[in-house]
Structures are given as structure tokens and as C-alpha cells.
């Protein structure tokens, strides 16, 4: 969680084009996400990842999203990444085999115990919390009940799920996350980011202070 003195970081996810990289960086994004799970409409291959990742300047984190993929596949992509985001049913042992720092995405299904999950994934650099829809590993464009997030989680929380420029200020006030993660909320069409929406989202975050 953040404290009142910390700013909320922003990750723009699902980037597929050079111009979207440029727009996100110019707007002040802290991290850029690339979907490397082939089941997603926003997925890119390794050649495109290499081109896009090379365009990212220093001090902006390059994050790759994976869903239950083989270790060797993740390692191959990870040459172009700074951080791995595991969005499937990966066990703590699966995560621990990786050489790259990682965060674990958790879908907020009924009955989930975030304190227990935090203990299970104790080596994670953070926990990304996303809406739950059966059979869909992420990218639902849906929010969830933010009051279900405990205020005293020890690990950094990255809040995802249905965030837009219209609701991100409320999300920050209510959750006080370390970071927020947006994809569809800054798109003109699936996989195509809108520079104006990116700027509006970053502006809302930068002008919002956690209580």
C-alpha cells in the first residue's frame, strides 16, 4: 500500500505499437506492459517485443504478462523485460524458478484470502489485484469491490480492473494502492491506445493524493 506521502505509480498495459510507447512515456507512465500470452487479442510475438522494448527509455519498467506458460518460453521473452507478471495459476514454486523479478496477479474470486496469498507468494515484488470472471485470466474491463482489499497488506498492491480516467481518483482514495494498471481504459480500440485517454488518466493520477 502507499502512504499519504507517496505518489501512485502507473502501468499502461497491452502495448502493441511504437507510437503507443511514445505516448505512454511522454505522459509519465512508470511501467509499460506487454501481453505475451497468445490467448489475448493484445498479444505480441518476441520480434515485436524486442522492437518495442528497445524503444523504452531508462527508468521506465518493461513488464511482460504471462499465463501458465513454460519456464523456457518466459525466460526467452524475459531477455527484453525488467519484470514478469504472472497472471495464471502459477504456484509459488513455478514463480520461484524464474530468474527475473516477478509480480503475481490475483483475480478477486469470492472467498479469496489476500493475507494468505501474500504469504504464499512471499517472494513476489508485489500483488496485482484484478476482477474475477470464470475462464478469463484478465483484461475483463470490469471493476470489483475495492472494499475487499485489506488496508494492512504488507506487499505493494497494484490495482487493476476496469480503471479509467473517470474512476481512478476514487480508486486511489479508497484503496491507496502502490500502483494502478490500465489497458482498455486508455484505448481507442482493442490493442490501440489513445494518447488523449492516456494523458487524461495520468493527469487524474498525478492530481490525486491518497487520504
From Swiss-Prot:
EC number(s) from the headed UniProt entry: 5.3.1.24
Domain of life of the native organism: Bacteria
Keyword terms: Amino-acid biosynthesis, Aromatic amino acid biosynthesis, Isomerase, Tryptophan biosynthesis
Family of the protein in this entry: Belongs to the TrpF family.
Pathway(s) this gene product operates in, as recorded in its UniProt entry: Amino-acid biosynthesis; L-tryptophan biosynthesis; L-tryptophan from chorismate: step 3/5
GO MF annotation, one: phosphoribosylanthranilate isomerase activity
Catalysed reaction, written as an equation: N-(5-phospho-beta-D-ribosyl)anthranilate = 1-(2-carboxyphenylamino)-1-deoxy-D-ribulose 5-phosphate
UniProt cross-references to Pfam families, sorted A to Z: PRAI (PF00697)
Listed GO biological process terms: L-tryptophan biosynthetic process
Protein name as it appears in the record: N-(5'-phosphoribosyl)anthranilate isomerase
Amino acid at each position: 500500500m502507499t502512504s499519504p506521502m507517496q505518489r501512485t505509480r502507473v502501468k499502461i498495459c497491452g502495448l502493441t505499437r511504437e507510437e503507443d510507447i511514445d505516448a505512454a512515456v511522454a505522459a509519465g507512465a512508470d511501467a509499460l506492459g506487454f501481453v505475451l500470452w497468445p490467448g489475448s487479442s493484445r498479444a505480441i510475438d518476441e520480434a515485436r517485443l524486442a522492437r518495442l522494448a528497445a524503444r523504452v527509455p531508462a527508468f521506465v519498467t518493461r513488464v511482460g504478462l504471462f499465463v501458465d506458460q513454460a519456464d523456457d518460453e518466459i525466460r526467452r521473452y524475459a531477455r527484453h523485460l525488467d519484470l514478469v507478471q504472472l497472471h495464471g495459476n502459477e504456484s509459488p514454486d513455478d514463480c520461484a524458478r524464474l530468474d527475473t523479478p516477478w509480480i503475481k496477479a490475483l483475480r478477486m474470486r469470492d472467498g479469496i484470502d489476500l493475507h494468505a496469498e501474500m504469504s504464499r507468494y512471499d517472494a513476489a515484488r508485489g500483488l496485482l489485484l484484478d476482477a474475477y470472471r470464470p475462464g478469463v485470466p484478465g483484461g475483463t474491463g470490469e471493476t470489483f469491490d475495492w472494499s475487499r482489499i485489506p488496508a494492512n497488506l504488507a506487499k505493494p498492491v497494484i490495482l487493476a480492473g476496469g480503471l479509467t480516467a473517470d474512476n481512478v481518483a476514487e480508486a486511489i482514495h479508497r484503496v491507496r494502492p502502490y500502483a494502478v494498471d490500465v489497458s482498455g481504459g486508455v484505448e481507442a480500440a482493442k490493442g490501440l491506445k489513445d494518447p488523449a485517454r492516456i494523458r487524461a488518466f495520468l493527469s487524474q493520477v498525478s492530481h490525486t493524493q491518497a487520504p
